[in-house]
Amino acid sequence: MTVSTQTRRLVLPPPYSQHRIAQGDATAEAAARAPAEGAGTLIWRWTAGGPKSGPGRLDLAVVLEPDLALPGARLGYVAGMAALCEALAAHCPPERDIRIRWPDELRFDTNRLGGARLVLAPGSAEGAVPEWMVFGAELIADRDNIAVPGEYPHSISLTEEGFDDPPAIIESFAAHLMLLFDRWKHEGAEAVARAFAGRLEGGGAIGDAGDLMREGGREALGPALARAPRWRDATGPLL
């Protein structure tokens, strides 16, 4: 049964507080609310696609309040990506492959499904604890705007892959994120790093600051996320 985009409401555990938006940038909305509403504020958007509106979207953004200086705090982004991968995997057949193309693109069986971003509080410095951060993700919910089959062979959507209730992914994400933060607390940063590294396209390991380590060298997460993402443009995920 396909759930209506108009009536769906998330079922989230504490400490999350949800706000649904009909349009606009969920990540920007979360950043605007972060100073006043704080950690656990979750903004989401679920819209249907069409010839005039473009592809359907499933977007989420959650406010985090780290207690580590920025290099360590960026592991919150690593946890967010790993949690999103686990949420997607929980709602698709086990033979389907969910991968992260470093540092920010989500791939579903080699096709682009969307990606993620990290927004920092203004004035955040490398040696200081950020006042807040926002982990935001955007997924292609449907591609009903495509008039010619096969026109965009490098992307895929949730609807095409049988996700009948896309917001359930956000509910699973929220639970997996809490679980990963708990593992981080009790098992150390390595638990979060392993969860992300296990989904990396092309393999590799993740360091304590979220940096990518491969045979060819090390790439810092901060500068990688600061670059313009290749998976989206100003309007959202690329098809």
Task: Annotate each PLM feature.
Residues F108, R214-E215:
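Structural motif
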Residues L158:
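Surface-exposed, charge/polar-rich loops and edge strands
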Residues M1-P93, A195, L221-L239:
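N-terminal lobe of the biotin/lipoate ligase/transferase fold
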Residues E161-L212, D233:
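Conserved, helical-rich catalytic subdomain that frames metal- and/or nucleotide-binding sites
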Residues H19, H91, N145, H154, ...:
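Histidine (H) residue identity feature
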Residues D142-D144, E161-E171, G217-L225, P229-L238:
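RNase H-like, two-metal
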